[in-house]
From Swiss-Prot:
It comes from Thermoplasma acidophilum (strain ATCC 25905 / DSM 1728 / JCM 9062 / NBRC 15155 / AMRC-C165). NCBIfam families: PRK02277.1. The gene is gfcR. The lineage of its organism: Archaea, Methanobacteriati, Thermoplasmatota, Thermoplasmata, Thermoplasmatales. This is Transcriptional regulator GfcR. Pfam families: Pribosyltran (PF00156). Contains an N-terminal DNA-binding winged helix-turn-helix domain and a C-terminal regulatory domain (or effector binding domain) resembling phosphoribosyltransferase (PRT) domain. Belongs to the purine/pyrimidine phosphoribosyltransferase family. GfcR subfamily. The keyword Transit peptide does not apply.
Amino acid sequence: MKSIEELYKRALELKNKGMSDKEISTELHLSVNTVTWLLSKEFLKEGAVQDVKIGWRSVGVFGSRIISIAEIMSDIIREEMNKNSFEVDSILGIAINGIPYATLVSYLMDKELIVYRPHPARKEGVFSSNFASVEGKRVVIIDDVASTGETMRRTITDVTKEGGKPVLCVLLASKMSVNDLNGVPVRSLIRTQVIGGS
């Protein structure tokens, strides 16, 4: 586990490279509020921010481990399909960390692959033209970690605007306490919760 000082140094290093707080939060798997808090050196003051750092490097360094997680995600998707009687046409991976999982889930379930890149500053993201389109498709959205759900909400909105129907969101880990976003069910392998504190 990284210390707060190490996180501060890494956040500052990324900021000095020109990354926005949103981009830094994605890279460090922290909420934007936590990144802002770190960069303002508020952690030097009394009290602590309420956030949890999620790191999954032990999974990400080997494709065999990623496919094991993708198999669990596929099982969750099938469970939801059976429980809620819906079909799936496509699997969408949110860049960058959702793409490896979505690619393998797409392969395991024999579904089309959609790649979506959220924009760190604007509301609308971009769908990669090298992969499947969303129009007329029932879509499962996959990402690694959701802190506030903002990226997932924007993805749901953009899929809908492009004529697709988001049917499920699947995450490796969720810091959110909600079970759906914009009416779309959210399932995660791991759900974190901060208990106690001030």
